[in-house]
């Protein structure tokens, strides 16, 4: 594993810290290492939730490493099968990822956060997609994911001028889930991770699968699709041991013991 990444396992929770001073910028080598970490997380049955954060208190990530670019790394370089930062193009990850944004999330750093399922950020965090000012475009998910969260007027200003969005503004628009102090950031992310662990893993997988498949469908079409039998996790949930365990635990006034089957 790359020296730029620190991995910590806390039971079913994996913490990934990107540590590349000064700005946690990401070159192709680092992107490959991040992709390996996320794919291992996907494939490890003992892991349930991942938290991605940046080292230090100033930068979550400044995105693409412009020093590497100046040395010849092309904008369309191979960043690995998971896409830039290892997560932006993993489309079969049925476990939740939390971005704990500890500071500036610019360019590909913002796109990394957008690829997560939840964003918890520090009060000093801010978000921007300044690629147009560098002669490129935010094509690692920024131009695809941000329009699903914000009105066109806001998106256009952010992607065409590089305007920054503060943590509080991001919270108002629903781009982030929580804004906390820097000192509370990781505790808040871990609290959310534990809440996710408390939910049934098959149910979480089915929810992510349904979101991916039906997010652009009319409601009626979505109903037909999820009942058509083509989904992997949804039918499994309905006939799982966990589907029996949940109501049984509720009736017995105890915490459920999920088996993931």
Curated annotation (Swiss-Prot):
Keywords: Lyase. Pfam families: ECH_1. SUPFAM superfamilies: ClpP/crotonase. The active site is at residues 111, 131. Its EC number is 4.2.1.149. Signal peptide: none annotated. It comes from the Bacteria. One of its GO terms (biological process) is carnitine metabolic process. Pathway: Amine and polyamine metabolism; carnitine metabolism. GO terms for molecular function: hydro-lyase activity; L-carnitine CoA-transferase activity. The keyword Lyase applies. It is an enzyme of class 4 (lyase). It catalyses: (R)-carnitinyl-CoA = crotonobetainyl-CoA + H2O. InterPro entries: Carnitinyl_CoA_dehydratase, ClpP/crotonase-like_dom_sf, Enoyl-CoA_hyd/isom_CS, Enoyl-CoA_hydra/iso, Enoyl-CoA_hydra_C. Catalyzes the reversible dehydration of L-carnitinyl-CoA to crotonobetainyl-CoA. Belongs to the enoyl-CoA hydratase/isomerase family. HAMAP family: CaiD. NCBIfam families: PRK03580.1 (NF002936). This is Carnitinyl-CoA dehydratase. It comes from Salmonella enteritidis PT4 (strain P125109). The gene is caiD.
């Amino acid at each position: 594993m790359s020296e730029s990444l620190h991995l910590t396992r806390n039971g079913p929770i994996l913490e990934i810290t990107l540590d590349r001073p000064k700005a946690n910028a990401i070159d192709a080598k680092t992107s490959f290492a991040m992709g390996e970490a996320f794919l291992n997380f996907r494939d490890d049955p003992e892991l349930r939730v991942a938290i991605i954060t940046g080292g230090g208190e100033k930068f979550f990530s400044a995105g693409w490493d412009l020093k590497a670019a100046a040395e010849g790394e092309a904008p369309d370089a191979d960043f690995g099968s998971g896409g830039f930062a290892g997560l932006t193009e993993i489309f079969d990850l049925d476990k939740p990822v939390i971005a704990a944004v500890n500071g500036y999330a610019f360019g590909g750093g913002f796109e990394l956060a957008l690829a997560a399922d939840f964003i918890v950020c520090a009060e000093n965090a801010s978000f921007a997609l300044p690629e147009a000012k560098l002669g490129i475009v935010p094509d690692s998910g920024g131009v695809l994911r941000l329009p699903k969260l914000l009105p066109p007027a806001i998106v256009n200003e952010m992607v065409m001028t590089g305007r920054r969005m503060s943590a509080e503004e991001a919270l108002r628009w629903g781009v982030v889930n929580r804004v906390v102090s820097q000192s509370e950031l990781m505790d808040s992310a871990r609290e959310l991770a534990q809440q996710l662990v408390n939910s049934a893993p098959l149910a979480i997988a089915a929810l992510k699968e349904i979101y991916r498949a039906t997010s652009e469908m009319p409601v009626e079409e979505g109903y037909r699709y999820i009942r058509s039998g083509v989904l992997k996790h949804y039918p499994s949930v309905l006939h799982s041991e966990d589907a029996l365990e949940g109501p049984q635990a509720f009736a017995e006034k105890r915490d459920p013991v999920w088996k993931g089957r």
